[in-house]
């Protein structure tokens, strides 16, 4: 006969087991969209056998400690400055507890996920699964969703998904599921010209057309060129079927940077990425990025071409890249983070983005964390800020639609350096399309406080309610972004947009890195703590011009509510059009030598 205390223990034990069993049979919603995102139309369900490559992000218990570590590594004067992490050290720091990984892996296998398709990468788990398996496992239904502006573009998505309640605290997100983003090239306009006549007067000519020599003159670079070095590689992101053409690049160098004749770039293929040389598609973005990243720096340059809409397991439903449903950002980031330190680029320049609100919050946070991981490993991640000024549609996409300025992502991630655009010289001015503002997702980092709060004090209550004053300020810096000469398909044209500003700024950073490496110092890595600290005196404040937007138009259906006179003005100090200003290479070179 059991004693009373023994009976109590047995009852408690049975109760705990019953609770665990109950939790295993209940589900908790991880992500849910209130409606189908604007610009998408729900279509038919995919075939049950259609294969999807899933990315599962685990909850990071050490997220705050990790982010502080990244800031410390990147802050001049800190004892850890420049001590970038190896891949193994980073993975070990972020790796979840073994029991967490084991429980999720067991769940995947119980759901029928083939063990050989599972890649356990520490804080992320990747796996392939059929639609029917995913629907059972995530208690959801997938459909094809078509781009209302381009019916040839469609993807497999759902509006919500759930996981077992006992696993929910450890799962941050699973994608592709609720991510309906439309990454766009940040090119405001393209003007095709047969020839561009250049005069010997750099000042006069550079108000009409920007070339590498113009940028050298404007930003006081002189004849500085980076020494090609595997430790100082500029990585250029290629998405959306943009191809970097060798013949166009050679012609550009011959005409606009003849001192670099013989320079070249290499290509790395991610997923099903291609770099077609005979495609008839417009590749101005790829040409622009390569021309100025390399033509202004001479640094070793790599074009990372990622399949247009992410990696694809081909099948009858998605037979080719035109019908690809997955996410290129995640694919590129996981590829780069898998590289050993001696193969990792020192700089990653990307001229693509989308409205921040179009990106699910958990996706935004998880992707931003991956950019932070690149920062921890010493990569300067540079993004164009966008070409919609204060915003385009300026309307929230939730159930309650209200007017709102639209920040862009990934430019709004605090761990990337966001580059706005200027035009003209003497004086250099903010250009109207340069995107900026304040993130609705990411809180302003402390090192931005002095600069941004000074601006907000001057702004007062203007535009109150249309932005979040607590948000990360965008952009960080600016560079010329109007009428860049570029070669595409054998013809010279001019391109405007922050997509021109980003590779130009990346090239300047490569030249600064070269100075540090020649002095046996590490590359600059994550730039923002430096920009808002010791580096700030190396930027020219832009106080003329401003951005515009919210004009009552959007690219999906043409109509949107207008916000009269919506704008951000360039002003003394940091502003949400040009950041802290444009680089002065002479001053920056002196600063980085002494860090």
UniProtKB/Swiss-Prot annotation:
Gene that produces this protein: SED3
Its Gene Ontology molecular function terms? metal ion binding; serine-type endopeptidase activity; tripeptidyl-peptidase activity
Keywords, alphabetical: Calcium, Glycoprotein, Hydrolase, Metal-binding, Protease, Secreted, Serine protease, Signal, Virulence, Zymogen
Please tell me where Ca(2+) binds in this chain: 541-542, 573, 575
Gene Ontology CC terms, in alphabetical order: extracellular region
Signal peptide location in the record? 1-22
The UniProt entry, under PROSITE patterns, shows: SEDOLISIN
Cofactor(s) demanded: Ca(2+)
Q: Which residues are glycosylated?
A: 207, 264, 278, 298, 365, 554, 557, 569
Q: What does this protein do?
A: Secreted tripeptidyl-peptidase which degrades proteins at acidic pHs and is involved in virulence.
Short name of one Pfam family for this protein?
A: Pro-kuma_activ
Which residues are assigned to the propeptide feature?
23-201
Q: Which residues form the active site?
A: 285 (charge relay system), 289 (charge relay system), 499 (charge relay system)
EC numbers: 3.4.14.10
| SMART domains, per the entry | Pro-kuma_activ (SM00944)
Claim: Metal-binding is one of the keywords in the record: yes
Source species: Arthroderma otae (strain ATCC MYA-4605 / CBS 113480)
Q: Which residues form the Peptidase S53 domain?
A: 209-595
Q: How is the cofactor bound?
A: Binds 1 Ca(2+) ion per subunit.
Which protein is depicted? Tripeptidyl-peptidase SED3
Reactions catalysed, semicolon-separated, are: Release of an N-terminal tripeptide from a polypeptide
GO biological process assignments: proteolysis
Q: Where in the cell is it found?
A: Secreted, Extracellular space
